[in-house]
């Protein structure tokens, strides 16, 4: 305990540094006598501070509290309205402010002009192009940096260099911001016209990005990269990130492979000491030179020089610097364009008649055949999911926007909302619900648009289609994805794989007679030429499928799906441009359909197959693998002779020529040693990931609270760190302090302590030690966890009112009646709860809940309520186990080579000792027999929590549960009476525990938990047959050992002599574990 609390205390003295400021620590203890002293201590502090007396003597008098109790929070108040930022900033604003080049970007509004030059009046102003969309302010960010600088001003040696570098960069930011004054944010953390009119429009988002970059500077190289990006991104708001990251697609082709990992038959990574030389034709170097020249033209100096220096010997040892540049380029922030430009981008492509019709035909046929292949089993067997597709669609309907705001009546309450789920309920109540009619999206009813912003790319538009489109596509797409799940070609969907498996797949076939072709097809996916052949291929496939069945319901499902494709072939979109709404005929494919991901993958696979079939007319090769991953596709081709420069050049030109014949504007490259796609890149036989998650700017605003965003910030920091981009941890912790503090009044604020923010309760935000998820087992930890659990989820009056209305009740019972054959309270209640949870995305409800949550939290942070909760958490289980473990020192040799060079040392060390894993551990119960049985007869998908609850019921009840979901009685009886059922109990418990312990998140997802090297450090004498207990003991031991190794860089072995008498007690407890959702778990989930 301590680092966070220490920094917190220092931070508060830094912020409130005037005479009138007071900090009062609040302590608690699970020991009732000490707890009494804590309460006395607190009231005396309050008394003294009211009288303006010093608190020093109280601290002495209550030494026992300060030493033995746990810090709960710090209450801080100050009568100074703190414009302290401005005052402090002047001290750092000693440099020359940046001047924006006002002609740096093609689009006028992307130039960093004064706001009043871009938007002459308040009415025209919008912050949508520069909104940081995060619930923390520029002034907080400036404070956090200045706090760090003040704290480290006297550092020595290497640390002093870091201080100097950051100070230098901050001087640029401070001088520029100070020139115009710090923009003040409003209550919603937005920057209004009055504040911004005399300041550069992009000042805030630029300053946020710059702060994020300068707080990630450690080495001299970091400093050079950051300086260049900070200075240039002030002017260039459009192409900088793209320019800096472009060379990577070529750099990966330049590094020889000298030893790599490949996927073996068991789908594990296995070291191979093969040597593959990088064969690079001159043309490639010319293209690279052109990229570097473009960088120089844009004013970059140091970055292109670093790349040129690396090119001298192209070594993998120095490649991490290239990876670093690639990652850093994304931290200049999001490129946010006007919707009109984003839409026109796809419509600008000139359509030519001069295309290869033969290739288009082949492309369409391949799409058609793939659609048929994916669905024919389901259609021939009249799959129940295709029969009840409407119900399945309704059950998984999201609460996203339906594209228009409507007035809805729920009982006596009238509300305005755009949410799909509410529209469906309302339509059903008013007889307007007609899933059999897919509304047109033509000129009479154009599609409203959403947006997707991403660093280094143009803004993309998203269709917000009426909910009928989702219902029509849901079931069919689910079937397509199920097929993709066991098809290796679909890297993104392939069963439980992770990116390491795809990495081993590529390196597996690289040799001196093979080349790999990799293409980024994101331009093609959203190009107009794609739309006709794409939709037609799908339609033709659906027509063939419709002739394979006589089931009217299945035919109807396919017919509706086909209708969505026909409608979308004639689509118009509505784009607000100033005050007018423009209607534009939009020919391209945009995301927003349920089928987007699946259909794009099918089309990309068809595209690369079409291209390869043309290339095969000219060359003789074997296609070893073809893979599609999102917007990228790649294939490894094996020739019967050794690859030469000339061959690489010829194949490369032919491939590009082939794409050109389809008028596909794509970036196609050929290499012998590496690839670069959006998700990952392989160079020198090693795998790299782009560490490009922005911390202080967000893509869009949602309805998450500050706490949620603090957890997301931390989670993003962890992901970046695993991928090789490290931001100063103290800075991150300072941001967490700022974002989790709660204002009580204008001058009174409460700051939660480390214990509150790191205990796994509903309020957890971060881990006290990076990469280690701790489950507190001390009395104080369990005590505070119980206290937080008593703060059960908050009620919302609006939600209750809606849920009590006839409209809502009828909807829920309609779903239940369609789904269930007989009464089943578990499922009915589950559906009602799910539907009620969907209401949370309606702002007034989430606001109401948040207020309740905050006030409960305020009470709790001032005095924890003792509450004897009968709920059992994973902490209780570990608390029971812990005493029986004995630790001794051990030794594990490093025996595996590095293959992910960007990992932090402590994580790398563990992988090198125990090995890595290429699969996700199943943590949703979907592999259990009961789950398979349910999905065989019903469209209902129980969650792991529900399965865990059901499987522990009496056999009679399980049987009733199954029968009510439409499972034939004979199957239900067989299941309950079989061995499979007892295996399931174990299997589901296992999944549930894995789920609770976040085993597929953070760095745990990289470790091989079944490593024999790890097993041999654990000794647990075998007693009695309770596999569940054996499992939890082993898993606990593994986590303890791994956590110890992450922290200390050395190994321990564990011996456990667990008494047989305790085992049955523990086993019973294990069936009552409550799962805890927190901002922290949501952030993990959000990473997914």
UniProtKB/Swiss-Prot annotation:
Any single GO BP term: viral genome replication
UniProt keywords, alphabetically: Magnesium, Nucleotide-binding, Nucleotidyltransferase, RNA-binding, RNA-directed RNA polymerase, Transferase, Viral RNA replication, Virion
Superkingdom, taxonomy of origin: Viruses
Localization per record: Virion
Cross-referenced InterPro entries: DNA/RNA_pol_sf, RNA-dir_pol_4-hel_dom, RNA-dir_pol_luteovirus, RNA-dir_pol_reovirus, Rotavirus_VP1_C
Record flagged with keyword Magnesium: yes
Reaction(s) catalysed (UniProt annotation): RNA(n) + a ribonucleoside 5'-triphosphate = RNA(n+1) + diphosphate
Assigned EC number: 2.7.7.48
GO molecular function, one term: RNA-directed RNA polymerase activity
Assembly and binders: Interacts with VP3 (Potential). Interacts with VP2; this interaction activates VP1. Interacts with NSP5; this interaction is probably necessary for the formation of functional virus factories. Interacts with NSP2; this interaction is weak.
Function: RNA-directed RNA polymerase that is involved in both transcription and genome replication. Together with VP3 capping enzyme, forms an enzyme complex positioned near the channels situated at each of the five-fold vertices of the core. Following infection, the outermost layer of the virus is lost, leaving a double-layered particle (DLP) made up of the core and VP6 shell. VP1 then catalyzes the transcription of fully conservative plus-strand genomic RNAs that are extruded through the DLP's channels into the cytoplasm where they function as mRNAs for translation of viral proteins.
Name under which the protein is recorded: RNA-directed RNA polymerase
Organism from which the protein derives: Rotavirus A (isolate RVA/Monkey/United States/TUCH/2003/G3P[24]) (RV-A)
């Amino acid at each position: 305990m301590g680092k966070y609390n220490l920094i917190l205390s220092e931070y508060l003295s830094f912020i409130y540094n005037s005479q009138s400021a007071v900090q009062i620590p609040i302590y608690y203890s699970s020991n009732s006598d000490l707890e009494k002293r804590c309460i006395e201590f607190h009231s005396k502090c309050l008394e003294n501070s009211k009288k303006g007396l010093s608190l020093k003597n109280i601290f002495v008098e209550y030494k026992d509290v300060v030493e033995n109790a746990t810090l709960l929070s710090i209450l801080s108040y100050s009568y100074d309205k703190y414009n302290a930022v401005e005052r402090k900033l002047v001290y750092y604003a000693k440099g020359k402010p940046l001047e924006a080049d006002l002609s740096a970007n093609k689009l006028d509004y992307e130039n960093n002009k004064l706001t009043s030059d871009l938007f002459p009046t308040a009415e025209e102003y919008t912050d949508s192009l520069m909104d940081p969309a995060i619930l923390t302010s520029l002034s907080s960010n400036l404070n956090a940096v200045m706090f760090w600088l003040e704290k480290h001003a006297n550092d020595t040696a290497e640390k002093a260099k870091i201080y100097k570098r950051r100070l230098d960069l901050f001087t640029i930011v401070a001088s520029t911001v100070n020139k115009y004054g710090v923009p003040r944010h409003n209550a919603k953390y937005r920057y209004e016209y009055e504040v911004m009119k005399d300041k550069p429009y992009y000042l805030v988002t630029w300053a946020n990005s710059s702060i994020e970059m300068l707080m990630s500077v450690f080495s001299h190289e970091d400093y050079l990269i950051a300086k260049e990006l900070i200075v240039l991104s002030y002017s260039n708001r459009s192409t900088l990130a793209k320019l800096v990251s472009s060379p990577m697609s070529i750099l990966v082709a330049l590094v020889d492979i000298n030893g790599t990992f490949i996927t073996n038959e068991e789908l594990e990574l296995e070291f191979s000491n093969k040597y593959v030389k990088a064969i690079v034709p001159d043309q490639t170097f010319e293209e690279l030179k052109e990229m570097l020249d473009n960088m120089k033209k844009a004013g970059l100096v140091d970055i292109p020089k670093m790349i040129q220096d690396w090119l001298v010997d192209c070594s993998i040892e120095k490649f991490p610097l290239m990876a670093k540049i690639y990652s850093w380029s994304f931290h200049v922030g999001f490129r946010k364009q006007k919707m009109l430009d984003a839409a026109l981008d796809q419509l600008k492509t000139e359509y030519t008649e001069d295309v290869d019709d033969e290739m288009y035909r082949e492309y369409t046929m391949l799409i058609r055949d793939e659609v048929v292949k994916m669905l024919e089993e389901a259609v021939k067997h009249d799959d129940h999911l295709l029969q009840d597709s409407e119900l399945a669609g309704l059950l998984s309907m999201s609460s996203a926007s339906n594209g228009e705001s409507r007035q809805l009546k729920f009982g006596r309450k009238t509300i305005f909302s755009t949410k799909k789920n509410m529209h469906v309920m309302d339509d059903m109540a008013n007889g307007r619900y007609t899933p059999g009619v897919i509304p047109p999206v033509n000129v009479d009813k154009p599609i409203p648009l959403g947006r997707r912003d991403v660093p280094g790319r143009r803004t993309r538009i998203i269709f917000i289609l009426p909910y009928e489109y989702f219902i029509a596509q849901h079931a069919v797409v689910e079937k397509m994805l199920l097929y993709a799940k066991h098809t290796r070609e679909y890297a993104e969907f392939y069963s439980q794989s992770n990116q390491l498996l795809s990495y081993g797949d590529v390196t597996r076939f690289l040799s001196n007679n093979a080349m790999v072709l990799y293409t980024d097809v994101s331009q093609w996916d959203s190009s107009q030429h794609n739309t006709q052949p794409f939709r037609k291929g799908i339609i033709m496939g659906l027509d063939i499928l419709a002739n394979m069945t006589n089931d009217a319901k299945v035919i109807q499902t396919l017919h509706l799906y086909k209708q969505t494709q026909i409608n979308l072939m004639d689509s118009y979109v509505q784009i607000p441009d100033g005050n007018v709404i423009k209607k534009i005929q939009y020919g391209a494919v945009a995301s927003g359909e349920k089928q987007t991901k699946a259909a794009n993958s099918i089309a990309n696979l068809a595209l690369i197959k079409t291209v390869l079939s043309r290339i095969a007319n000219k060359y003789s090769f074997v296609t070893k693998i073809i893979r599609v991953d999102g917007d990228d596709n790649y294939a490894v081709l094996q020739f019967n002779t050794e690859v030469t420069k000339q061959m690489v050049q010829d194949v490369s030109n032919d491939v590009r020529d082939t794409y050109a014949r389809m008028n596909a504007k794509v970036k196609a490259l050929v290499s012998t040693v590496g690839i670069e796609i959006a998700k990952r890149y392989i160079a020198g036989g090693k795998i790299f990931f782009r560490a490009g998650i922005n911390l202080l700017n967000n893509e869009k605003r949602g309805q998450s609270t500050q706490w949620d965003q603090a957890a997301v910030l931390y989670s993003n920091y962890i992901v970046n760190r695993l991928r090789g981009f490290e931001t100063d941890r103290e800075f991150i912790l300072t941001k967490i302090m700022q974002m989790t503090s709660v204002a009580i009044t204008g001058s009174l604020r409460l700051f939660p302590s480390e214990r509150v923010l790191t205990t796994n309760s509903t309020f957890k935000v971060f881990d006290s030690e990076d990469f280690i998820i701790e489950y507190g087992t001390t009395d104080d930890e369990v005590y505070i966890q119980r206290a937080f659990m008593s703060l059960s989820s908050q009620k919302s009056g609006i939600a209750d009112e809606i849920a009590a209305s006839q409209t809502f009740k009828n909807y829920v019972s309609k779903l239940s009646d369609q789904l269930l054959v007989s009464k089943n309270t578990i499922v009915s209640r589950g559906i009602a709860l799910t539907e009620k949870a969907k209401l949370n995305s309606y702002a007034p409800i989430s606001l109401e809940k948040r207020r309740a949550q905050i006030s409960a939290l305020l009470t709790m942070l001032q005095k924890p309520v003792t509450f004897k909760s009968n709920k059992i958490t994973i902490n209780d289980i570990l608390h029971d186990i812990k005493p029986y473990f004995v630790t001794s020192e051990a030794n594990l040799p490093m025996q595996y080579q590095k293959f992910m060079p960007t990992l932090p040392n402590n994580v790398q060390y563990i992988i090198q000792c125990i090995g890595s894993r290429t699969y996700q551990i199943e943590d949703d119960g979907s592999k259990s027999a009961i789950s398979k049985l349910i999905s065989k007869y019903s469209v209902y998908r129980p969650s792991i929590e529900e399965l865990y609850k059901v499987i522990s019921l009496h056999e009679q009840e399980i049987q009733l549960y199954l029968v009510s979901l439409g499972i034939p009685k004979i199957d239900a009886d067989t299941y309950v009476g079989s061995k499979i059922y007892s295996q399931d109990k174990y299997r589901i418990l296992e999944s549930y525990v894995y789920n609770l312990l976040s085993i597929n998140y953070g760095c745990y997802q990289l470790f091989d938990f079944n490593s024999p090297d790890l097993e041999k450090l654990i000794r647990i004498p075998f007693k009695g047959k309770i596999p569940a207990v054996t499992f939890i003991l082993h898993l606990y031991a593994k986590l303890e050992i791994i956590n110890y190794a992450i922290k200390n860089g050395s190994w321990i072995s564990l011996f456990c002599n667990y008494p047989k008498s305790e085992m049955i007690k523990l086993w019973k407890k294990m069936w009552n574990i409550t799962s805890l959702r927190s901002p922290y778990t949501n952030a993990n989930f959000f990473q997914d």
